[in-house]
Each structure stands twice: as structure tokens, then as C-alpha cells.
A protein has these predicted regions:
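Short, solvent-exposed linear motifs at loop/edge-of-secondary-structure regions
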Residues: 64-67, 71-76, 182-205
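Short linear functional motifs in flexible/disordered or boundary regions
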Residues: 41, 82, 146, 162, ...
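Short coil turns that connect the paired helices of HEAT/ARM alpha-solenoid repeats
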Residues: 122-126, 154-160, 185-191, 228
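Composition- and surface-driven signal marking solvent-exposed, interaction-prone regions
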Residues: 9, 43-49, 79-88, 133-134, ...
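C-terminal luminal/periplasmic domains and tails of membrane-associated envelope-modifying transferases
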Residues: 127, 132, 159, 195, ...
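Amphipathic alpha-helical scaffolding segments comprising HEAT/armadillo-like alpha-solenoid repeats
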Residues: 110-122, 143-155, 173-185, 206-224
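Structural detector for internal amphipathic alpha-helices that build alpha-solenoid repeat scaffolds
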Residues: 96-108, 129-142, 149-152, 160-174, ...
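Primarily the internal scaffold of c-type cytochrome electron-transfer domains
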Residues: 1-126, 188
């Protein structure tokens, strides 16, 4: 398919690929690449990111993996060793955003973690939701310097990323914050406009120029209306 040049044509429904008997649950693509979890106690959903099983991350981070969903009598270490043995030349065991997210969650090595999260946020090879999550996790490391360094993503094409970048600006000086956030008060996406208004709540109106006050006031009204919706 010319739309997906990195995907090579191959027959994946073979024991050489999935290492299971054809026709069994282990041979089904969805059970290895679309693991299922129950949400809200009633709703079973499959992961549509279609990922390669990473039991090595289970060993490192305690995350779930497809292999042990079926092989419940085996350890993650066993699964990781099996995957490594069967796919020794795999390129899918490279570092992933999961390690940075786990470090941020556990407040490990704050400076190094913040740098990794910034890299993830600026990497357009990552999905928008991943980049936005990295920005959201950066809030615990918020500083004027981080506000400055993350400011370019305020102009990102993805509204999810723009919205997630806004809270980081709350540590920026008032005048700089207004300068950076004013365009987002008129963003085409309502969620971005509301988040921009919220991020300016503590800025005194005296910092806003007369020509811009109407823009700020309109955004604040929309923010207030969102609270009553």
C-alpha cells in the first residue's frame, strides 16, 4: 500500500509469526496486538493502537502485556525471554515514552525526567495524545524556564497538544503569559479557548492592553459559561 510505505507485504497468519497453532486464540491478531481491558466494571474494550507485545516493559515497569494475558501461569520475565528468543533482531524493544511517564509518575530524577518529557512533547512522530500526556505530566515540574521552552507547542497543529501546553504557562511572568496566550483565546477549538482563559485567571486586568481587553473578556465569559453547562 503506497499510503503506508514502511509496512512490508507479508503473511502474518502463520506459526512463524505468532508461534501458535492456527485457529487458536493465540493465533488471533487481536489477542497479541489489541489487548482487552474492562472499563467502568462493565465495558470491555480493545486497544486500537495495535502495539507489539512488550513483556520487557512489564519486567521494568510493571505494565500489562498480551503474552501474560493468556499465559497466566508464567512470569513476565519468561514472556520477555521468549519474545527475545523468537525475535532476536526486533526493532520493537527500543526505549519508549512509557519509561519517561513512569519516572514522572514516581517523581524519579526530576530534571532528567522533565527533559525526556519535553522530547516526547516535541516529537511529531508520537501520537497527539502521547505528546499531550507528556505536557500534562510536565506540570509537576513547572517553572518559568519550562514555560519558555514549551511555548513553541502552543502553536502546534494538534488542539490536544495546544490545550495541554497551556497550564505550563502559569509560571510565566504576566506580560509574557498574555503575549503567548492571547492568540489562543481566539483558537478555533473551544476546549483550547477555555483552557487559555483558565490559564489567565490570576493575571490582573491592568496587564491587558485596552485593545485586547475585549478579547480577554469574551474568553472569560465563555469560560464561565462552560462551568455552568
Amino acid at each position: 500500500n503506497p499510503q503506508f510505505p514502511s509496512l512490508r507485504k507479508a503473511d502474518y497468519d502463520t506459526a512463524q509469526h505468532h508461534f501458535h497453532q492456527p485457529g487458536t486464540a493465540g493465533a488471533e491478531c487481536k489477542n497479541c496486538h489489541m489487548i482487552e481491558r474492562v472499563y467502568m466494571g462493565i465495558d470491555a474494550r480493545r486497544d486500537h493502537s495495535f502495539r507489539v507485545p512488550r513483556p520487557d516493559l512489564s519486567v521494568l515497569l510493571g505494565t500489562p502485556n498480551a503474552c501474560n494475558d493468556c499465559h497466566k501461569d508464567k512470569s513476565a520475565e519468561w514472556a520477555a525471554a521468549e519474545v527475545s528468543r523468537r525475535f532476536p533482531d526486533s526493532t520493537h524493544r527500543q526505549p519508549t515514552f512509557a519509561t519517561a511517564f513512569a519516572a514522572a509518575w514516581n517523581d524519579v530524577d526530576q530534571k532528567g525526567t522533565a527533559e525526556e518529557l519535553l522530547k516526547i512533547a516535541f516529537d511529531h512522530g508520537n501520537a497527539g495524545i502521547v505528546r499531550a500526556t507528556a505536557l500534562a505530566m510536565l506540570e509537576r515540574f513547572a517553572s518559568p524556564d519550562l514555560a519558555e521552552r514549551s511555548s513553541p507547542v502552543l502553536r502546534d497543529a494538534d488542539p490536544l497538544v495546544r490545550s495541554a501546553a497551556l497550564p505550563l504557562q502559569q509560571t510565566a511572568p504576566p506580560l509574557l503569559r498574555i503575549e503567548r496566550l492571547l492568540p489562543l483565546l481566539q483558537d478555533p477549538m473551544r476546549s483550547v479557548r477555555i483552557e487559555a482563559a483558565r490559564s489567565l485567571l490570576d493575571v490582573p486586568t491592568s496587564y491587558v492592553s485596552e485593545t485586547d481587553k475585549s478579547i480577554v473578556q469574551s474568553a472569560m465569559r465563555e469560560y464561565q459559561e462552560s462551568l455552568l453547562a
